[in-house]
Amino acid sequence: MTKKTQVGLIFGGNSSEYEVSITSAGNIYKAIDKDKFDVHPIWITNSGYVASEADSYKVLEEPGYMVEKNDKTANLSNLIELASRPELDVLFPIVHGNLGEDGVLQGLFRLIDKPFVGVDVLAAAVTMDKEFTKILAQRAGVPVAKWVSIKRYEYEDAKNQKLSYDWVSGQLGTSNLFVKPSNQGSSVGITHVTDDSNYAEALAEAFKYDDKVLVEEGIVGTEVETAVLGNDHPVVSGVGQIINADNTWYSYENKYSTESTTTLQIPAQIPAETAEKVQENALKIYQITECSGMARVDSMLRESDGEVIFNELNALPGFTNISMYPKLFEEAGISYPDLITRLIRLAEERYAHKKTILHKHD
């Protein structure tokens, strides 16, 4: 009998995307092939407490479950101890947001010498920052929405011209703007701005979540997403379409609320040559940011000329019931359990390759 792979499933975290992580982890736990894998959950509560394995199992079954003891003492050592157990063969982090998908956890996994699912340290750090990702996308020849970057020190300078809606909209050539934290996911902290009335409020909201805020031109058109899977030779899924109700956008509420007015359409109802361009751009961005394992790439099809405009790359896409990433590969013939298996095997392959690289001179 083949020995089953022991998987440490790490989820939760002190993040604005905590609930998304809990839901994603629960779905992975239910869908994983139990004939191939044993799951050892590691739950980080929303206050940063690393729970016991028994409590971690319980919250997967009851997402609203809370631990009675919530002492953060020696928390890092608790996480290291749980994640570095000899019996664990591979780690599967599904911690969204700050400290989870920005390279911090990935660096810890490298230090404790464990294979892990998803992108490595560099790609995690780079793709968490929307501005750096856009700069690299431009370098790869992929069109992006125009933007203005505002650092906190600029925001705190009352005389800075970037605090003027008229100046920024003039720079971007449109009154249709999105104000967003540069390092956040799930549309947290994003505001759609179309005039001066809520620009200051939008900046204040975004700066709650980051020290750098982007003001982007709003692209009028069709929102599409595609999924990428693999290491050195990645494959790209078909294209899915986000259909928003009139006068709405793909906000946090529309992504996760039961009262969402947004629907997902797979495959997207777009011309074949446009879908191919979306996939081609996604692959370019995946490779120039040195992603491995997985990523979801979001784009806009500009209504005026049909050009494919890169929006964002999510290197740790959600695995909720309504998440586009697993649905796109399901449409491509890769089931949810098989997708999880492939992600784990990709982590093992990358780890084995890393072991062949010399880190000191003989």
Swiss-Prot record:
GO BP terms: cell wall organization; peptidoglycan biosynthetic process; regulation of cell shape
UniProt subcellular location: Cytoplasm
Pfam family for this entry, one: Dala_Dala_lig_C
Enzyme class at the top of the EC tree: ligase
The keyword Cell membrane appears for this protein: no
GO molecular function, one term: ATP binding
InterPro entries the UniProt entry points to: ATP-grasp, ATP_grasp_subdomain_1, D-Ala_lig_Van_CS, D_ala_D_ala, Dala_Dala_lig_C, Dala_Dala_lig_N, PreATP-grasp_dom_sf
The reaction(s) this protein catalyses: 2 D-alanine + ATP = D-alanyl-D-alanine + ADP + phosphate + H(+)
Cofactor(s) required, per the database record: Mg(2+); Mn(2+)
Gene3D superfamilies: 3.40.50.20, ATP-grasp fold, A domain (3.30.1490.20), ATP-grasp fold, B domain (3.30.470.20)
Residue stretches making up the ATP-grasp domain: 134-345
Cofactor annotation remark: Binds 2 magnesium or manganese ions per subunit.
Any one cellular-component term (Gene Ontology): cytosol
PROSITE patterns referenced in this protein's UniProt entry, alphabetically: ATP_GRASP, DALA_DALA_LIGASE_1
Protein name listed in UniProt: D-alanine--D-alanine ligase
Family statement: Belongs to the D-alanine--D-alanine ligase family.
Superkingdom, taxonomy of origin: Bacteria
